[in-house]
Amino acid sequence: MNKEIFDLKMGRISKHSYVDFALWGGIVGDYDNQPGSVKNNMADLVDLHKCGVAAFKGFTCPNGDLFPTVNMGNVRKALEILKPYGALCGFHCEEFGQVLEREKEAKAKTGRTSEEKIRDFLDSHDVWTEYVATKNVIDMARATGGRVHICHVSHPMVAQVVKDAIHEGLPITAETCPHYLGFTEDFV
């Protein structure tokens, strides 16, 4: 998330690595409603690029305390800062507001948090959370010309949005995970 953390990780990994590796830099947001949230790291992005990170990644929904959620203002700012360097910015796309509301609904009905029950998790992280966040991130790429990678696309509808953006000529890439192609919620 900053040069100090990069140097710490690089020092630890370099001593024990027998293979070539690269580190991604984190894009850290500043959502106020996340417990223990740190301020965004927009001021550190250029230094991280100069350190040699392979790319950057941010999360549009919570992913634990280490990677506070980015909002669309953070996404746009990061793309603006990193565009002159041609840096790739990856985003794990799930629209945070929808996730929060759906988690509240699930907890009110069942008394559980979404992490306690797979069905509740799937309901609160449905395709629409991914679709809306992906469209928003693509719009920020459109606004800035910054290079974007959509991480872990999980639904054909989202893949189509990415495909349309690529055909439009936007600098967008995406990938999926093997288990998204082979497993259904029944298997989980």
Show which residues each predicted segment covers.
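Secondary-structure boundary/capping motif
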Residues: 1, 33, 66-67
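Active-site beta->alpha loop and helix N-cap motifs at the rims of alpha/beta catalytic domains
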Residues: 25-32, 37-38
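A glycine-rich helix N-cap at a beta->alpha junction
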Residues: 12-26
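Metal-associated gating/positioning segment near the N- to mid-region
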Residues: 1-16
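Histidine/acidic residue-rich metal-binding segments in metalloenzymes
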Residues: 39-188
